[in-house]
């Protein structure tokens, strides 16, 4: 077939975690960890554009040439399903990443270390698949993350170069069915935020929680290693402020929105990066996203005023300033609304277009 190659060189802005042979250790960058996150985001985008995406935990798609679209949802057509091969290959062809810090174990409430540095991905596929993946990576560079553990602030990256980019830019289609997925990730119910501020290089050392880490030799060393790479682990500070300082609501809803590592584990719907130097080189940036679902995993509705409370707190500059010990800063939110409301499919499409 007329398969082509695309090479994407990227640099980690926060540690990248893709799992490893041994639980809790990442010995190299694993393609499967990147693929899983690309699929998760593509599912959310497809649902947000009104298309069909099966639930990956109970996949319904099996290739059947007698059915419309061969019996495959919009996502499985690209990412593969039983009897249907993925439309592209992904390989890590250069891995210059190293451990984010050298643990003694159990340091920094943000373990495990993950990897930092530059990596090059090679994507092989048809023109259309490569154009789609380029658009998806460009979107994630600005708003999302790759790999696992985004709830710890991991996986934020910057694209340095794309070689062999498709001549035809990808156009996000309106998938038009307007189906509703109240309990599955759907970009219509995502809010994105970006906080940018200027501060002297040592601003982070005055935050009490990080100051405490500096007071112990083993955590101080890990923290210094991160700082040298321009990564300040502020995610736990912000999440603690939003959850323990400003959340008022029932425990059931709190656990579902903010997550829990106890059994059964629930992944946080609110994800925020670490602080890293912005592209302009003169300021710092912290960004993230929140998914505000209509229902929890058991099909119980979540009252809109609880979702509004989370959105309002994310948009509250004073919470950011207090948590980070900063006096200035600009907070940008999408959608730019003070009262939370879901996007329309057209709104999602226009938002995606901005990144191209």
Regions found by a protein language model. Name each.
Residues 1-356:
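Basic, Gly/Ser/Thr-rich N-terminal segments that form RNA-phosphate-binding interfaces in CRISPR RAMP
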């Amino acid at each position: 077939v007329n398969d082509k190659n695309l090479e994407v060189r990227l640099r980690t802005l926060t540690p990248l975690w893709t799992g490893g042979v041994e639980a809790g250790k990442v010995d190299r960058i694993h393609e499967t960890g990147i693929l899983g996150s690309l699929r998760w985001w593509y599912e959310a985008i497809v649902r947000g554009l009104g298309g069909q995406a099966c639930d990956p935990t109970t996949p319904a798609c099996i290739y059947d040439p007698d059915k419309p679209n061969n019996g495959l949802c919009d996502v499985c057509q690209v990412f593969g399903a039983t009897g249907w091969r993925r439309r592209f290959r992904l390989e890590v062809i250069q891995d210059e990443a190293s451990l984010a810090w050298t643990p003694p174990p159990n340091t920094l409430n943000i373990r495990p270390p993950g990897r930092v540095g530059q990596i090059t991905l090679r994507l092989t596929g048809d023109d259309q698949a490569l154009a789609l993946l380029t658009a998806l990576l460009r979107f994630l560079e600005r708003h999302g993350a790759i790999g696992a553990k985004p709830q710890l602030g991991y996986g934020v990256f910057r694209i340095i170069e794309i070689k062999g980019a498709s001549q035809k830019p990808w156009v996000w289609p309106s998938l038009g069915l307007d189906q509703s997925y109240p309990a599955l990730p759907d970009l219509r119910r995502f809010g994105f935020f970006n906080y940018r501020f200027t501060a002297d290089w040592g601003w982070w050392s005055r935050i009490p929680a990080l100051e405490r880490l500096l007071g112990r030799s083993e955590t101080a060393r890990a923290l210094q290693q991160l700082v040298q790479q321009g990564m300040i682990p502020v995610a736990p500070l912000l999440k603690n402020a939003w959850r323990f300082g400003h959340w008022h609501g029932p425990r059931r809803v709190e656990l579902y929105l903010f997550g829990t590592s106890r059994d059964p584990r629930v992944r946080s719907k609110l994800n925020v990066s670490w602080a890293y130097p912005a592209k302009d080189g003169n300021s710092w940036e912290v960004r993230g996203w929140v998914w505000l679902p209509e229902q929890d995993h058991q099909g119980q509705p979540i009252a809109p005023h609880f979702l509004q409370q989370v959105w309002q707190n994310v948009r509250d500059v004073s919470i950011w300033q207090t948590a980070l010990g900063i006096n200035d800063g600009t907070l940008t939110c999408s959608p730019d609304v003070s009262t939370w409301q879901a996007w329309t499919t057209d709104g999602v499409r226009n938002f995606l277009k901005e990144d191209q």
